């Protein structure tokens, strides 16, 4: 039986698009929230809008430009290069407070829409330097939001314990692997589909896809 309403935190990337399809199988009414936080590549926002339109999912684009004023990182500043974190430090692509703020604003929107369910694509496999992708953070924020608004929100994280190979497997199970591969934007250089192939995000995505396709081919023999 399908649940009533849900809100998806949506970026047009592999993970959030996988979650969008996951949510479409479970909710009668679905809304996507897209955040413009001053990211270097506006193509990300357009990609999310295009996918939402193609899938018939109503969406809102919210201006979160203040976040760009508060914190400097490689996703919003041209003069900061993409670098992995060293010695326990966060990578240059970490946007401090992003998931905290996005989920908080998504909850406010969900309340106005009469929705109790909020879906996000964060996962522990992304934790390396990204503290706001941890399960403990999401559960803590879920409690805080319910106390703050006297609501009964449930934040769903379908990918929390999946690696990239398993995320591709989920996409394939839903019949959306090729769509997600071709239409989404994960690349730090702002290139849709398989991307530039060299940035850390593209490499993580491609390695997961290669592992899944090899495993699938082996199982079919």
Swiss-Prot record:
Comment on bound cofactor: Binds 1 zinc ion per subunit.
GO MF: ATP binding; ligase activity, forming carbon-nitrogen bonds; zinc ion binding
Main EC class the enzyme belongs to: ligase
Entry binding sites for ATP: 10-20
Keywords: ATP-binding, Ligase, Metal-binding, Nucleotide-binding, Queuosine biosynthesis, Zinc
GO biological process, one term: queuosine biosynthetic process
Pathway: Purine metabolism; 7-cyano-7-deazaguanine biosynthesis
Binding-site residues for Zn(2+), renumbered to this chain: 187, 196, 199, 202
Pfam families cross-referenced by the UniProt entry: QueC
Leader peptide range in chain numbering: none
EC number: 6.3.4.20
Coiled coil region boundaries: none
Catalysed reactions listed for this entry: 7-carboxy-7-deazaguanine + NH4(+) + ATP = 7-cyano-7-deazaguanine + ADP + phosphate + H2O + H(+)
Domain of life of the source: Bacteria
Transmembrane segment boundaries: none
Cofactor(s) this protein requires: Zn(2+)
Keyword Oxidoreductase attributed: no
Subunit structure: Homodimer.
Family: Belongs to the QueC family.
Biological role stated in the UniProt entry: Catalyzes the ATP-dependent conversion of 7-carboxy-7-deazaguanine (CDG) to 7-cyano-7-deazaguanine (preQ(0)).
PANTHER family xrefs: 7-CYANO-7-DEAZAGUANINE SYNTHASE
Protein name: 7-cyano-7-deazaguanine synthase
Name of encoding gene: queC
């Amino acid at each position: 039986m399908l649940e009533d309403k849900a809100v998806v935190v949506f970026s047009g990337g592999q993970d959030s698009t996988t979650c969008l399809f996951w949510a479409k199988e479970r909710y009668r009414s679905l809304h996507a929230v897209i955040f413009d936080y001053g990211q270097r590549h506006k193509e990300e926002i357009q990609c999310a809008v295009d996918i939402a339109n193609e899938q018939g999912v109503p969406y809102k684009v919210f201006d979160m430009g203040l976040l760009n004023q508060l914190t400097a990182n490689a996703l919003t500043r041209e003069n900061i290069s993409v670098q992995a974190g060293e010695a326990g430090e966060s990578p240059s692509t970490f946007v401090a407070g992003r998931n905290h703020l996005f989920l908080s604003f998504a909850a406010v929107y969900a309340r106005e829409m009469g929705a109790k369910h909020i879906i996000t694509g964060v996962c522990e496999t992304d934790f390396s330097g990204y503290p706001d992708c941890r399960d403990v953070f999401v559960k803590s924020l879920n409690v805080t939001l319910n106390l703050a608004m006297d609501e009964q929100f449930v934040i769903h994280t379908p990918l929390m314990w999946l690696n990239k190979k398993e995320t591709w497997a989920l996409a394939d199970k839903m019949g959306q692997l090729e769509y997600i591969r071709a239409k989404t934007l994960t690349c730090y250089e702002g290139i849709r589909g398989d991307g530039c192939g060299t940035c850390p995000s593209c490499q993580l995505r491609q390695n997961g896809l290669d592992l899944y396709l090899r495993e699938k081919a082996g199982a079919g023999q």
